[in-house]
A protein has these predicted regions:
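Charged helix-capping and loop-helix junction motifs
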Residues: 48-52, 80-87, 115-122
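Flexible, glycine-rich phosphate/dinucleotide-binding loops
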Residues: 12, 108, 166
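Glycine-centered loop/turn positions within well-structured domains
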Residues: 28
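P-loop/Walker A phosphate-binding loop and immediately adjacent motor/lid segment at beta-alpha junctions
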Residues: 86-91, 143-171
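N-terminal [4Fe-4S]-dependent radical SAM core
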Residues: 1-22, 31, 35-42, 169
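Core AdoMet radical
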Residues: 35-50, 62-77, 96-116, 127-141, ...
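Short, charged beta->alpha transition segments
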Residues: 52-60
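Catalytic-core regions built around general acid/base machinery
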Residues: 86-93, 122-125, 129
């Protein structure tokens, strides 16, 4: 997996101060996407053990609330496979910090369902690591600058207490 960018001390992509990882690769190609260059799976730099260690170290300070995954598309199956070991390490090291994940896929139909478009052999484990999932493709006609943590009104901010039982997260 490649990644397009890392933002340290990010306050735009989740509650609190966070480290945000922008992965490369996305098959949605939403018109109006804010990060078109990250559609290409080969864009950016390889995600290595050193990258993972740097991200983990950036989350050590108490003022860092957690990690945010964006893209590109973190829930593309090939990205899930690369991210899962890192997310497991993150949860082991920081059990009180949260993980936010932005995806153009829809939770119930594309990720949770065994025949979903993005469901693969690691999806269930990946979702166990995610605390807040912002789901749904960006739709330019539904763009609303007043929305917190999402770009279009079709997107939902879901708190995942356990896979299969999401709740809308109050923002």
């Amino acid at each position: 997996m490649n990644y397009a960018n890392i933002k340290y001390c990010d306050i735009a992509n989740g509650l609190g101060v966070r480290t945000s990882l922008f992965v490369s690769g996305c098959t949605h190609h939403c018109p109006g996407c804010f990060n078109r260059e990250a559609w290409d799976f080969d864009y950016g730099m390889p995600f290595t053990e050193q990258t993972a260690d740097t991200l983990l170290n950036s989350c050590i300070p108490d003022y860092i609330k957690g990690l945010t995954l964006l893209g590109g598309e973190p829930m593309e199956p090939e990205n899930q496979r690369a991210l899962l070991p890192f997310l497991v390490r993150f949860k082991e090291k920081f059990p009180k910090k949260d993980i936010w994940c932005y995806t153009g896929y829809t939770y119930e139909t594309d990720l949770l369902a065994p025949d979903g478009r993005a469901h693969c052999e690691v999806t269930d484990k990946m979702l166990e690591c995610v605390d807040i999932l912002v789901d749904g493709e960006f739709i330019q006609d539904l763009y609303d600058i007043s929305l917190k943590f999402r770009g279009s009104s079709n997107q939902r901010v879901l708190q995942i207490h356990q896979p299969g039982c999401p709740e809308l997260f109050p923002v």
